[in-house]
Amino acid sequence: WNSEITHKLAQGAIDTLVKHGVKEENIDVMHVPGTVELTYGAALYVSGKKKFGMLKYADAVIVIGCVIQGDTPHFDYVCQSVTQGVTILNAQGGANDRAYYTPRYCPVIFSVLTTLDKQQALDRAGGRLGNKGVEGAVTAIKMANLL
């Protein structure tokens, strides 16, 4: 959803990570069909994502999305769901073994815009208020270095 905005946020995050020394081959981007599904995608990286037959663990996960308020309460439900999901991942970690729950912790950075209209989102995706994807990347670097 709102791909014009989320692509700008993601590119800002990627450019910032590379600028600060992260190798592009170490940046993995996953697309999910909607904002509510962001938490599931993040959980895969927290708990270890299989790639080329090997488990791959993230040093940090940046959850990027954009929810623009409409005429129904759906906005509130979506925003609450993704916020709560990210909070739970940060507080409780993810299971790195599905049979035996062993939590693994990894910072999950909330870079989801929740705006009243499209202009507010554009302003925060490289517009007059900067790029929240850039801020998410800086936060991810700082949090990964805490470990």
What would you call each of these model-derived segments?
Residues 1, 32, 66-67, 113-117:
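Short, ordered loop/turn segments at secondary-structure junctions
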Residues 1-33:
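Glycine-rich phosphate/diphosphate-binding loop of Rossmann-like nucleotide-binding domains
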Residues 7-16, 38-44, 85-86, 136:
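Short, well-ordered amphipathic alpha-helical segments that serve as non-catalytic structural scaffolds
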Residues 20-56:
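Active-site rim loops that border cofactor/substrate pockets in soluble metabolic enzymes
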Residues 29, 58-64, 105-113:
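Short beta-strand segments at enzyme active-site cores
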Residues 41-86:
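Glycine-rich phosphate-binding loop
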Residues 75-76, 80-147:
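C-terminal binding/interaction regions
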